[in-house]
Amino acid sequence: MDKDELFLTIGTMIVSDPEILAVEWDALSFVCSIDPGHRQMTGYCYAGDEWEGAPLGDMVFGAMNPLQELQDAMAAETGNRWKQALIHITRPGPEIDIQFEYDDPRRWSPK
């Protein structure tokens, strides 16, 4: 898959997860850390002025696989592997935006 297809796959897996479908949300955000032998994901659901931890169902956490593919593809192009990805999905749409952190492996991690 190319990078655009991987972005679409990641977003589709997240918004199609039954646990995500069961909650009201205007926006979702996920901080994903991928290092050799280690994967971690933290997520939040936003509805109006309210927020709560996002459910990490099988499809949401399964999005780590295409995210790993995306990391590999980007590293093959640039020679540099990112440490974290910040996934932000908003409604209406939904629209997906993914930002990447190459230096600080804890930049977006909960404090």
Where are these regions (language model features)?
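Contiguous interface-forming segments/domains that mediate binding rather than catalysis
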Residues: M1-K111
